[in-house]
A protein has these predicted regions:
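N-terminal capping segments
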Residues: 16-198, 355
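Intrinsic-disorder/low-complexity loop/linker signature
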Residues: 55, 113-116, 125-126, 229, ...
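Hydrophobic h-region of N-terminal signal peptides that target proteins for export
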Residues: 2-5
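Low-complexity, Gly/Ser/Thr/Pro-rich intrinsically disordered linker/tail segments
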Residues: 277-284, 288-359
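Short regulatory "switch" loops immediately downstream of catalytic or recognition motifs
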Residues: 189-194, 264-267, 318
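...with weaker cross-activation on analogous glycine-rich loops/strands in unrelated enzymes
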Residues: 197-287
Length: 359
């Protein structure tokens, strides 16, 4: 029996070595070093979760949590868990409960029966139904979309569950995720914490949070555009940009409608990597995802509004058949509404100070 024990010990040691190697390989510091880029990458990775669903290994991304953009026809509000401002650990706990539910199991079975069908989601009631009507299926294939903002229609093949199907369910039924500013707050909070700063406590009064309230609930995109000593305007020339800076995209009425955060600026290769949470993206990227801007390394005095820059992130309708975004890519969205000021870049003073401490 002694040789068997020895073999078991060797196997255990080998498995431990494999785990150690995988851990070292996946360490963000391997690529991003030990500075703020690594901290942002770690915070970004917290927004992904691996599950086995429908017999497949799936790397799920944190869904987008719309902020009542879809209640225009219903006149009633329904709330995403945490108002779109929850931290990843809190949200993944709820998401796992949803994915372990009997209703999601039935949803998976329905999408795996080998038959084409249309799934009809209803956001106000957090339910779904199915029709196998051939005329309805033909309408969907022909591009005749009958869905509404609060009742998305989705054509499925019946050949099994895909990651996009999981997203649809979590968005419409689970209603757990992050909105754009909630994701930015998550990143900013992690940066601040790495520098020894409690961002919520530091900005609670500025945000208008009352005692005992979660300050993150008040950190909407308009806060990042506020005239406050805690908000540092940044001239949006590439040479001025730093990891942790916040990109703001303006709406037609002059308010800021979307926010994202810069993770890295590679002045050698001419690439800006920024992170965001939105559903106006390719189906497989809806939710939290990375995006890029390409620039000429020899010309870093150029503004982000300059059309010579290449913004690689294309924008799509959240559900096939819905009205498309008026902007085909993030660059056009950033440059939009110049009469209102267009896009802009800011940084949080408390986060900037925390980054200084990290250095």
């Amino acid at each position: 029996m002694l040789p068997l024990a020895s073999n078991a010990e060797e196997n255990s040691s080998s498995e431990g070595s494999d785990v150690s190697r995988l851990t070292a390989y996946s360490d963000p510091a391997r690529i991003w070093g030990s500075g703020v880029e690594r901290v942002i990458e770690e915070a970004y990775r917290l927004c992904f979760h691996t599950r086995i669903l429908g017999g497949k290994v799936m790397n799920l991304r944190m869904p987008f949590a719309q902020d009542n953009e879809r209640n225009k026809l219903t006149g009633e509000d329904w709330g995403f868990l945490g108002g779109g401002k929850g931290n990843p650990a809190f949200l993944w706990e709820r998401i796992n409960q949803v994915l372990d539910s009997d209703d999601f199991r039935l949803y998976t079975e329905t999408l795996s029966d080998g038959k084409e069908k249309v799934i009809i989601f209803d956001l106000p009631t957090q339910t779904w139904s199915v029709t196998r009507d051939l005329f309805e299926i033909a309408r969907m294939k022909a591009g005749s979309y009958r869905g509404l903002l609060h009742r998305p229609y989705v054509l499925v093949s019946g050949r099994g569950l895909e990651e996009t199907d999981v997203y649809n369910y979590l968005y419409c039924v689970g209603q757990a995720g992050m909105d754009c500013s909630g994701f930015v707050w998550h990143i900013q909070s992690r940066i601040a914490a790495a520098g020894g700063v409690d961002l919520g406590r530091t900005l609670a009064r500025t945000l208008g949070a009352k005692h005992g309230e979660d300050p993150s609930w008040y950190a909407g995109t308009n806060f990042y555009n506020a005239k406050s000593s805690q908000i540092i305007p940044v001239k949006d020339e590439i040479c001025n940009l730093r990891p942790g800076d916040i990109l703001l995209f303006r709406a037609e009425d002059g308010r800021m409608a979307h926010s994202a955060v810069i993770q890295s600026v590679d002045f050698f290769s001419g690439i800006i990597r920024y992170l965001q949470c939105t559903d106006e993206a390719p189906l497989a990227e809806r939710g939290v995802h990375e995006s890029f801007i390409r620039f000429d390394p020899q010309n870093t005095a150029v503004s982000l509004s300059d059309p010579s820059l290449v913004w690689t992130q294309n924008r799509y309708r959240p559900f096939p058949g819905e009205k498309p975004s008026p902007f085909s890519d993030d660059g056009k969205r950033y440059r939009a509404y110049p009469e209102q000021g267009g896009g802009r870049v800011v940084r949080l003073r408390a986060v900037s100070q925390a980054i200084g401490k990290m250095k």
